[in-house]
Each structure stands twice: as structure tokens, then as C-alpha cells.
Amino acid sequence: MQAYQRDFIRFAIDRGVLRFGEFTLKSGRTSPYFFNAGLFNSGSALAQLGRFYAAAIVESGISFDVLFGPAYKGIPLAAATAVALAEHHGQDLPWCFNRKEAKAHGEGGSLVGAPLTGDVLIIDDVITAGTAIREVMQIIASQDGAKAAGVLIALNRQERGNGELSAIQEVERDFGIPVVSIVSLNQVLQFLEDDPQLKQHLPAVRAYREQFGV
């Protein structure tokens, strides 16, 4: 585990974004942990979050021309990542996002920001069912000269859907692009193992990983 990944897990726990206990997911599964990126909800938290996304991009080695933030949650994530890449890595890259509803006046269309062209890196919080990412792939496919280079999310739950694969593995298979994350559940497990105060949650998270993991 890289230092930035350990720092990210600590940061997510401190912000209440990553919690341990008993949570019922939309899938109906009872999970021993819950990740809610909506709680990165202050200026300082968003700035820090952008730095973690930027570090993961640099680490991944994915080459791309433009960042894309899917509406709604991906918009501040793409903005914060673009700022962090410029300020901390000397990479001043264009970014854009989509509107859920196309505007009939003003700029018009459903895309805002830089032109969506070249290799596109999609920034989002998590991939649960993969539905949102599939919609994004249609948006990218509709733009001349644009193609997806990859997807970056905060946490890979490494969890099976209804079949044998996770939603992330299905996206990778169907679109032939990498999906990378700041951290994965395996790294969260490693963090719990090393933390005396949180180690009590390790058996439940490990059992969940064994039952539903990929």
C-alpha cells in the first residue's frame, strides 16, 4: 500500500465517509462498512480529495487528454482533480462535465467546460451497478474524436454483482478500459489489520469479502 492510500483511508474515516458497523445496501446485502463520498463536503476536504485522485492518476500511468465528471457527483470530483493536477503535479489539463438535462438556450447542449475530445478519463466516486458509467460511455461515443481512456473512482469494493464479476470487471470487459481506484477493499482490510483501534472490525469485513468478493 502506498503512503497516499493509507492517508486516504485515514482521511475517509476521520471525515465519517468510511464507517464500520452494520449497513443495508441498495442491493439488500448487509455490509459491515459504508462509504459515502458526499461527506467530503467542505472546501478543505474537497481540496484534499482532489490531491488523492491526482496521486492515483499519476500512479496509474493512464495517459489522457481531458477529465470528465459525470453529473452530478462526478462534477466537483473532476474539478478538484484538475486543480490538484495543476497545482501539485504541473499538469494543466482541460476538464468538462455533462448536464442531466440539455439546455435550450445559452451554451446549449448537455456538455459544459472544455471540448470532450481525445482520450477521456472519467472521474467518479464509486461504481455500484455500472449503469451510470454505461451512460457516460454513450455520451463519449456520441462525440467525434472522443474515446474513453479509463475510469478513476475513490473505492473499489471488489464485490460481485448478481453474476461472478463485479460491476467494475464488467465495465472493464465490456469497454476494454481500465478502472482504477484510490484504494480497494483489500487495502482497507490491510489498514484495519494495522490499526489497533479499528482491528475489531476486521473479522466482519473479511467475512463479507470472502462471501461477496471477487
Swiss-Prot record:
InterPro entries per record: OPRT, Or_phspho_trans_dom, PRibTrfase_dom, PRTase-like
Binding site for orotate: F34, F35, T128, R157
GO biological process: 'de novo' pyrimidine nucleobase biosynthetic process; 'de novo' UMP biosynthetic process; pyrimidine ribonucleoside biosynthetic process
Family named by the database record: Belongs to the purine/pyrimidine phosphoribosyltransferase family. PyrE subfamily.
Cellular component GO terms held in the UniProt record: cytoplasm
GO MF annotation terms: magnesium ion binding; orotate phosphoribosyltransferase activity
Coiled coil spans: none
Name of protein: Orotate phosphoribosyltransferase
Reactions the enzyme catalyzes: orotidine 5'-phosphate + diphosphate = orotate + 5-phospho-alpha-D-ribose 1-diphosphate
Pathway(s) served: Pyrimidine metabolism; UMP biosynthesis via de novo pathway; UMP from orotate: step 1/2
Cofactor(s) the protein requires to work: Mg(2+)
Signal sequence coordinates: none
Highest taxon listed in the record's lineage: Bacteria
